[in-house]
Amino acid sequence: MRERAVGGALASTVEITSASVQRGDLIQVGGQPCRVVDLFQLAHGAKRLVFDSGELLTMHARTRLVAMRMLRRW
């Protein structure tokens, strides 16, 4: 699904795992949108996500989430 975001950028919903999560992904947690600003590699394929609010979320290797991702076009 693609839709126009603020400023005319294209946004798409994507399924993410600890292997595919990126900085800038927008993940809805508990009904609140959280933007990933940093991430750290952990043991066994897990990653610790840091959101713009300062909150943390650990994604294990088998965790699957849906995120909104801005598509970059150059």
Predicted regions and their residues:
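Intrinsically disordered, low-complexity, charged/polar segments
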Residues: 2-11, 56-74
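Short acidic/polar mixed-charge low-complexity motifs
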Residues: 32-33, 53-55
